[in-house]
Amino acid sequence: MTVNSSRNALKRRTWALFMFFFLPGLLMASWATRTPAIRDILSVSIAEMGGVLFGLSIGSMSGILCSAWLVKRFGTRNVILVTMSCALIGMMILSLALWLTSPLLFAVGLGVFGASFGSAEVAINVEGAAVEREMNKTVLPMMHGFYSLGTLAGAGVGMALTAFGVPATVHILLAALVGIAPIYIAIQAIPDGTGKNAADGTQHGEKGVPFYRDIQLLLIGVVVLAMAFAEGSANDWLPLLMVDGHGFSPTSGSLIYAGFTLGMTVGRFTGGWFIDRYSRVAVVRASALMGALGIGLIIFVDSAWVAGVSVVLWGLGASLGFPLTISAASDTGPDAPTRVSVVATTGYLAFLVGPPLLGYLGEHYGLRSAMLVVLALVILAAIVAKAVAKPDTKTQTAMENS
């Protein structure tokens, strides 16, 4: 293969990954922006809605726990193709559940979507980390930026369809159908074999240290837990938080969610430059503090204008947590699929615990007060941000040789 053909193949591979990050964001936002309507159709309380969302958490955790084995057994290409296809099936189940007004079936649909999305996300990130190493530059934040761009597009469509009175059932089904062609076109650019038969590192980290004794990896897990909680709580609860906590209309609640996704998108598309310029530690710490400021203003200030600005800060603050911790995890040793899975699993604990916890607290104390938990975790992430530091050159060379 010539240099030009290799470069072109890498470029096509990168754009395919952009699509595979964009599409899950679009699908996620397609139902997340309709949560007020979904709650009304299913006739559930806030606490019961938290229980329904628990299906997403269970599915996501199940998928991500299997992801490292799947990637090492079948390779990223096959895992991405199958799991992304199953995610579309999950969306179709959501539409059917709304048509049947079945909270249980909706939770099952979220479980299918979550399991597919969880497995796909690890495979996509492993593929993205491989591309990042080949390009020798920071690109994972931009890839995650396409996820945020997808959520922004989905939020915009959701706002428009809500304003025009299009039923959530129809909206979610259309989103699933739109996703079919991009999956089967983009997968052609992904090479076969990435991550397949990777070294077995499920029990030990660098230099034979068990994962549960790898202090840096554990602290990276704390960072991703906090930042994923901040991101996930907005994805699950922000429209309802604005409708019930600040008195916005459902359409305005979708608009506010679009502001959050705008902040996420801008942060991820610009994050690579800041990381290369200032270091991962500085960027994680600044992001966490910015997110804490935005969340704090939403909790303590009763102003529509302030809420609109604050969700952008929230989005900017949460934007780089996941991609940076994925990059940091891949630095700790040679077994990228397992290490990415360990950190991603920790992050998904936030998605597992978050919806029911915030739903329970919101039912008893109000959603604004429930967000104090998110605020505390984001501040903790700023404190332990040093864990995401890049290894020195000698350590990095030793890991690459291994």
Curated annotation (Swiss-Prot):
Major subcellular location class: membrane
Regions of this protein lying in the Periplasmic compartment: 35-48, 101-103, 162-164, 231-252, 302-304, 363-366
Membrane topology: Multi-pass membrane protein
One matching Pfam family: MFS_1
Transmembrane intervals: 12-34, 49-71, 78-100, 104-126, 139-161, 165-187, 208-230, 253-275, 282-301, 305-327, 340-362, 367-389
GO MF annotations, alphabetized: transmembrane transporter activity
Protein name: Inner membrane protein YbjJ
Gene: ybjJ
